[in-house]
């Protein structure tokens, strides 16, 4: 299971943040942290500080360990009683070299630590506990849980922590410096309105961090070997845009910056912002003089001064990579800029492809919105080439959500052997097409033979409890009460105005047990909000990280699955499985790897979806591939999937519908049984009006 350990640095969010869009609004002295399900977090606490722990989704125990100033376990500091041996935290940390080293450096004695378990296994959504600290301490908070069997509905889920500081300094600025990715080679603070140089070797990594948010940082990189020969070879923005086919590179296939000799200099590995500039110059004296600000500090002069020691010629302007600079060109060919998208702690991670001499600035512009009207510091770290870092952008479900780096699906190990063309979708890397097939061949294989495609980014939620059916009947347009156990239904999920929030499929696993498979993560938040409003006794548990899936589609898909899918006598076999039904199955035999098979798909062909835990995904892929060789099975990427689903008349958010489209306009009016569903549901009244008076033709 992937590491979910995080050592927390201070994150102060004050009431003044309301002036800065996109930043969290919390009372002065309140900090917010998260504990991922199946992981743990560590925070430093001072006397009289209050810790509020919220069990967001319920049915999740919490393990707490407290270390006093001497590094010894002391639960009494938080008025907690010992009732466990901290087994989960000890096991988790033992498997993580980085956090083990960190605890050792802080002299925290985990081996002899005891813990307190708070929250019951049946606690409700939103249940909370507040603890007050008697003394300075380090608190380790865990959300214990193992990998969820796909036949079960008990994923470990997140906890939210609010730390109310007894003493704090109120400030208008936030400053978040994320933990180092590993042991840094260089740590360089670039103070506001200045620039700093640094050198890296080929293969090493450069992390440029915006600790305060909304701060531009101009970046230059010189080829060190050429520089030693008196040649000033730097990143060429035009060459880069030409070769990469975009305004600037990003993580993935088109990720490199080039010099004027068409040689790659650096590669973008991670980018948590996704908005930069390669069209404009680093700010110059002329820029400010033209606005009437004579003698204003500027990045060009700062660069010239700092680069002088390398005998680099001064220039009137530098064509830099303007990190975090938010620029755009509109439909009328007018260039514009606005405040940066970067938030406190956001960063870009580069990998040097040559020995480089670099310089980074903390732009001094304070006369417009380029730096949010308030220049702040930049922080640079470099890392050894020995450790590899995943390629990623940051995914945020909501504006105040904790950013999540792009993940690899459980099937990525297998699909990455067949292609390098991956695109980011909903926080995951998915194959766009495959190297030895291509879009047309993949499309043809789906229509004539069989394909397998990775659809793991679909959001999964376990809906449990005595009011589970009532909640789904109220929030979905379909008549959920007509579902039998083992049945799947495709449905819309609407707002009160009748427009669509999401579409997806609902699995009925038991009388009070459902599994919602949707396209958007917010659908889970919506379900929680409605459950709270209706005071339903129900749990909505996030399960996306525990259930990944591939679709096996095409005329030969049934024959492929028949070769390796075992089902108990009480379940329908693959041959018997009807349209929009699922079975509880295993691979090969009754003690084989657990899977769920549904006769569903997104292609219009005969097809099935196989659902499994990510740790079992490689085995599932191999089984499908081995069984499919006889039928010339082909992997299918997003490009070909788009072709087959359009031909089949299957809709996709952002294309055929959005939050201003009702189900009738989207072409799925069949999911709204207004005449036969007597119970009320969200949007029903408006949908009756919209059906009688269509808004769009």
Question: Model regions: which residues?
Answer:
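Intrinsically disordered, low-complexity segments enriched in small/polar residues
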Residues: 2-391
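Glycine/proline-enriched, intrinsically flexible loops and inter-domain linkers
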Residues: 372-697
